[in-house]
């Protein structure tokens, strides 16, 4: 079976309020840490102004008191990649694929199924803090590496920020997808192309219940198709011809 790893996003869209689920021990440690920080501390950590820091301080207090809203993670994040993922009006098979094959990598929750209920938060792996005397990447490394202990095919739609949480040994198991536009023979890529294409690709995988790499290579989405010459066993490249 294929498992697809996607990152969180800075943009979020809060949509509902549901009873709180049980939190992992690691998540509780991070919440406890942030709930002790002052507004001034948060200004320095987030590099934001006092007004924004006050809002973050209140959010962490509400987090600790379990007074924040909860949303399915795949619907909470609203960055460019997420806006290009089909997230509403899913068929039964699409919902099953989303539940069983799509996982979100988080600096607060670890690796979670895409439909897990979570709260809005401001935290990524570039945040300069120490938890138990470790960076967030080191703090989560064992948890992330444990996720890789299966025979499933691990497809990465992650940025370097998230991939480097894994130890080098486990990182080697990831299958990367690259998205390139061919403009009159000139191959080009940039973050906007990649983020949109990741969302479109994930949608195509879900709609077609893609469970093997061979099936993935056959998919067509938003003008992209697999290019064997630009690919290898660990890097699958999809090219979109622009006229």
UniProtKB/Swiss-Prot annotation:
One of its GO terms (cellular component) is cytosol. One of its GO terms (biological process) is response to hydroperoxide. Signal peptide: none annotated. Belongs to the UPF0246 family. The lineage of its organism: Bacteria, Bacillati, Bacillota, Bacilli, Lactobacillales. This is UPF0246 protein SAG2081. InterPro entries: YaaA (IPR005583). It comes from Streptococcus agalactiae serotype V (strain ATCC BAA-611 / 2603 V/R).
